[in-house]
Amino acid sequence: VQAAGDQQDTLDRVGLQPEAASRRVRTYSKGMRQKVGVAVALAKQAKALLLDEPTSGLDPKASNEFSELLVQLKNDGAAILMATHDLFRAKETGSRIGIMKDGALVRELSTDEVSHADVERIYLEHMH
């Protein structure tokens, strides 16, 4: 169990307001729920996060905040595996991009070796 100060530090780190700790999760927006999941992982000192479409359904502001959080976690040494259809977000937050088709990995790239234009072109090559 985290001490109250540690709990608030964790909530702050993921961008949740202090009153979030006293509210029921069902009252949270989708973006807040995503952040709660990351907060739980941080509280448990998880070394890896597995995320399935973490920014789908989020408004642009919440999506950007969540992506910034993922970049911070990556920079702090967390391993993050994120399944997403948003390759531009993957390029911004990841270090590697894998493109899958019919359940098979068809391409793997370093985010350093591709531009945003390349990402779209490569994606379209494999999806059609």
What does each of the following model-derived ranges do?
Residues V38:
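Hydrophobic anchor residue at the start of the ABC signature
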Residues L49-D52:
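Catalytic Walker B motif of ABC-type/P-loop ATPase nucleotide-binding domains
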Residues P60-A62:
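Helix N-cap at the start of a conserved alpha-helix in ABC-type nucleotide-binding domains
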Residues N64-D76:
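Helical segment within the ABC ATPase nucleotide-binding domain
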Residues T84-H85:
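H-loop/switch region of ABC-family ATPase nucleotide-binding domains
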Residues A90-E92:
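A short, surface-exposed alpha-helical micro-motif characterized by mixed small hydrophobic
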